[in-house]
Regions:
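Periodic small-residue-enriched repeat registers in elongated scaffold domains
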Residues: 1-99
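C-terminal intramolecular chaperone/autoprocessing and neck/assembly modules of extracellular spikes
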Residues: 94-172
């Protein structure tokens, strides 16, 4: 396997330089990466993947050199090789994805200080646009929710909507 690498378990592979793979059918191919669990793959430089059947980090963004857009830490929660998924993902640039509900018992504080922002442009009167947004009651992942639909926000405030790697929309 890789130089100065360690593989422990059933059919594990540590092919990246100074990488570690543990568990069953896990692969650490990125340099300095770690894959632990069942069918986990850590293919990016310095990445750590735990759990089973992860989808992020399973194809290299950058295997032998550091990239801020690559996954730093992933918890895989897939069912099998045809149904790979991630419960949690943190990129080296700090972007974080939680794939289900996030429960916080303390405060969530989001910085909005004008001193942190640049190129500030007024949107003008936004009240007429806000009145076009219709709140909804809906079911999501088996739970009753209240909120808005990203597609409706996108029609009125397209700059507030982004798309993830799976083409799912999110509201900022």
């Amino acid at each position: 396997s890789g130089s100065r690498s360690t593989a422990i378990g059933k059919t594990t592979t540590a092919s990246g330089t100074s990488s570690t793979a543990m568990g069953e059918d896990s692969t650490a191919s990125g340099w300095y990466s770690t894959a632990t669990g069942r069918n986990t793959i850590a293919s990016d430089f310095g990445s750590t993947v735990i759990g089973q059947y992860n989808s992020s980090g399973s194809s290299a963004t950058s295997a032998s050199s550091f990239s801020t857009s690559a996954p730093a830490f992933v918890i895989g929660n897939g069912a099998d090789s045809s149904n790979k998924s991630d419960a949690f993902k943190v990129l080296f640039n700090g972007d974080t994805t939680v794939s289900n509900d996030l429960t916080v018992s303390g405060d969530v504080v989001i910085s909005s200080d004008a001193r942190l922002k640049s190129n500030i442009v007024s949107l003008g009167s936004t009240l007429p646009k806000l009145l076009q947004i219709d709140g909804k009651s809906y079911e999501m992942k088996g739970k009753q929710k209240i909120g808005v639909l990203a597609q409706e926000i996108q029609e009125v405030f397209p700059e507030l909507v982004s798309e993830d790697d799976n083409e799912m929309l999110a509201v900022n």
